[in-house]
């Protein structure tokens, strides 16, 4: 009692200032940890080599590892206390961790993962879920929530994770840091608890692209090589339609950055839905066996189904016996997903493997050695803590459709933060071909500064209006129209060219291009009208004369058509199309 009174007297003696100091100290402790760590430890790097040898490449950096990586003397917890209770401490350290320590980095702890590293929410009922420092009332994302939080709070310079169905990409996007998923098989999974053996890829988080790249070079054991720039940057238009936030808030940032660094000619647009329909034929067999062949299901949704099926099937292959023996308390959402999984026949397994291989080849064919595919990382800002949004069918469908592209193909992918929307982090993702990890890391390092420069467009709508003029938005619409035209989507092309005209109605090219699409649909009167407008704006627009000549010919106005083709020849004397058309029509006069 005397001791308690003394303590009370000391506390009172501190006065108001002292109480405030104690409060601030407590708050500081909470902020520094944010519930990211399971264990604090210290793995020190070896001594530096003697000069003239260079110091270790990761000298001075600290890192944490998600609690799926083995470290000698520690039980790898796998996000569940019953797993800890029924397993021994690791007798060896994961080669991935050892490589980083030998490379000069200091490992300072193990971080929280979702239960069995299975979910993408970042919430774990067995441990206090890490707090998202970028949006404390929102989920941090999983599976490797603690690792992302540790990086976001500056507790470490980088952190290791495992990415199966988004385990690194998702928390990076939700916490506003960089997250890299390596190509499947590029880094050994030895000493890592498997989730889904055909999907698991090592990944890592960092706050800056230089650290992300340094870590990648050590883990991937990359020799020195000249840095290469992309020669094509492809925006997957249909993927951006899955967004619940304004599409332009992301696409315009990427577009402006690419134009500034490499020029507008590198930018392309692709509809992955139609591309995968022809390039991944085994998806049709998958749809047939799952009795959804007669239902209109997008190829991206089918890929998501394949990813989820593989994850559940292989998870049970790896851990089903342990679950049946120990009977641990499992989160109902995870339990329902695992229990949904039926046994796969050999034929079905072969079909799933064929889909993986075909998807990898398809993306490789699309990107080649110098292309980057741009997609949203996630469909929306982080859901609120405790909400059912993350488990809703709509959210899961959208998210897994985006995440399945790199998971199924085994390609490398990086999450790049792009500021905030409604006070929550948002991001974009770049995908490189399988094995193109170095190229993707180089591209991120090159583009990151300009992406952050233009991310003010995302953060502040007012700055968006200043940074992106109507004329520039019109050009973006025109380019999308050109892509639709190439894909023979004439009506879509007309809509996009019309959008460009609405934004900037004094550009002859927009009218001339729309006329070309009208010609394909037999809209000869509309084509003639558009060409006339184009010629009014630009008297030397050869294509407008050629297209109006064609429209007039189809409308029976041979005299007008001949005049147009002749004028085109005045502008371009060697134009074969104009010459042949004029000569042909003269014979009928």
Curated annotation (Swiss-Prot):
The keyword Repeat applies. SMART domains: TPR. The chain crosses the membrane at residues 2-22, 142-162, 399-419. GO terms for cellular component: chloroplast; chloroplast envelope; chloroplast outer membrane; cytosol; plastid. Coiled coil: none annotated. Disruption phenotype: No visible phenotype. It is found in: Plastid, Chloroplast outer membrane. Chaperone receptor mediating Hsp90-dependent protein targeting to chloroplasts. Bi-functional preprotein receptor acting on both sides of the membrane. Not essential for an efficient import of pre-proteins into plastids. The transmembrane domain and its C-terminal lysine-rich flanking region (LFR) (26-61) are both necessary and sufficient for targeting to the outer envelope membrane. This is Outer envelope protein 64, chloroplastic.
């Amino acid at each position: 009692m005397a001791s308690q009174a003394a303590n009370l007297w000391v506390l009172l003696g501190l006065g108001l200032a002292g109480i405030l100091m104690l409060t601030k100290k407590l708050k500081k402790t909470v902020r520094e940890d944010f519930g990211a760590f399971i264990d604090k430890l210290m793995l020190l790097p070896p001594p530096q080599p003697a000069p003239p040898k260079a110091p270790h490449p990761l000298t001075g950096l600290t890192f944490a590892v998600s609690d799926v990586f083995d470290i000698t003397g520690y039980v790898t917890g796998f996000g569940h206390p019953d797993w800890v209770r029924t397993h021994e401490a690791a007798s060896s350290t994961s080669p991935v961790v050892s490589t980083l320590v030998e490379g000069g980095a200091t490992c300072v702890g193990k971080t929280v993962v979702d239960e069995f590293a299975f979910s993408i929410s970042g919430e774990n009922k067995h441990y206090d879920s890490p707090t998202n420092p970028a949006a404390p009332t929102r989920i941090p994302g999983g599976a490797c929530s603690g690792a992302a939080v540790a990086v976001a709070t500056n507790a470490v310079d980088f952190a290791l994770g495992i990415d199966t169905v988004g385990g690194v990409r998702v928390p990076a996007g939700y916490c506003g840091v960089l997250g890299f998923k390596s190509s499947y098989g590029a880094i050994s999974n030895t000493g890592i608890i498997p989730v889904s053996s055909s999907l698991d890829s090592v990944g890592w988080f960092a706050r800056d692209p230089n650290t992300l790249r340094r870590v990648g070079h050590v883990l991937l054991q990359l020799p020195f090589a000249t840095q290469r720039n992309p020669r094509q940057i492809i925006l997957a238009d249909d993927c951006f339609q899955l967004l619940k936030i304004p599409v332009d808030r992301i696409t315009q940032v990427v577009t402006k950055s690419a134009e500034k660094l490499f020029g507008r000619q590198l930018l392309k647009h692709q509809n992955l839905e139609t591309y995968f329909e022809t390039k991944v034929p085994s998806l049709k067999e998958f749809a047939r066996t799952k009795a959804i062949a007669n239902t209109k299901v997008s190829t991206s949704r089918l890929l998501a189904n394949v990813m989820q099926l593989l994850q559940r099937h292989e998870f049970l292959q790896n851990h089903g016996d342990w679950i049946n023996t120990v009977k641990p308390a499992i989160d109902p959402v995870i339990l329902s997903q695992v229990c949904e999984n039926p046994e796969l026949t050999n034929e079905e397994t072969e079909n799933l493997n064929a889909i993986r291989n075909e998807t990898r080849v398809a993306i490789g064919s699309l990107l080649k050695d110098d292309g980057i595919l741009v997609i949203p990382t996630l469909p929306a800002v982080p859901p609120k803590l405790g909400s059912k949004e993350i488990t809703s069918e709509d959210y899961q469908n959208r998210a897994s459709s985006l995440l399945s592209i790199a998971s199924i193909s085994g390609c490398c992918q990086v999450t790049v933060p792009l500021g905030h929307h409604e006070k929550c982090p948002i991001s974009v993702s770049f995908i490189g071909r399988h094995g193109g990890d170095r190229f993707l890391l180089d591209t991120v390092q090159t583009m990151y500064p300009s992406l952050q420069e233009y991310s003010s467009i995302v953060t502040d709508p007012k700055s968006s209006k200043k940074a992106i003029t109507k004329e520039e938005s019109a050009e973006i619409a025109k380019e999308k129209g050109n892509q639709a035209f190439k894909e023979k989507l004439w009506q879509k092309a007309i809509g996009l060219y019309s959008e460009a005209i609405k934004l900037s109605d004094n550009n002859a090219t927009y009218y001339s291009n729309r006329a070309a699409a009208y010609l394909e649909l037999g809209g000869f009167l509309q084509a003639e009208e558009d060409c006339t407008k184009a010629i009014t704006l630009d008297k030397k627009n050869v294509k407008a004369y050629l297209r109006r000549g064609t429209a007039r010919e189809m409308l029976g106005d041979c005299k007008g058509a001949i005049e147009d083709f002749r004028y085109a020849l005045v502008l371009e004397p060697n134009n074969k199309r104009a010459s042949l058309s004029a000569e042909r029509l003269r014979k009928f006069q």
